[in-house]
UniProtKB/Swiss-Prot annotation:
Protein name: Integration host factor subunit alpha
Keyword DNA-binding: yes
Function: This protein is one of the two subunits of integration host factor, a specific DNA-binding protein that functions in genetic recombination as well as in transcriptional and translational control.
Classification via PROSITE patterns: HISTONE_LIKE (PS00045)
GO annotation (BP), single: regulation of DNA-templated transcription
Origin species: Methylococcus capsulatus (strain ATCC 33009 / NCIMB 11132 / Bath)
GO CC entries: cytosol
UniProt KW Acetylation keyword: no
Amino acid sequence: MALTKADMVERLFSELGLNKRDAKELVDQFFEVIKASLESGRSVKLSGFGNFDLRDKRQRPGRNPKTGEEIPITARRVVTFKAGQKLKATVEALQEPELGKLDAERTGEV
């Protein structure tokens, strides 16, 4: 199961003792700062976690999968995320039993 903003609010409430309104405001403001930075064309670098960057993609040819008709895919700007070294190391260090547990939680088999 994916971590949601509501889950983050609940963790801030239970682990840090913030009231739910303040915890929600903190989570919302955190994402708003990231969004505003990206909207202004600036990258976001979170030490120990990773980087959000903007990338411009050129127009390219595509194909309609139903009809096979060739159609242009327009140029656009996309957000990319690259995990930092610490985050990569933490994920790679997961033991096999932990991975199985995570898979079971994700599929609801726990």
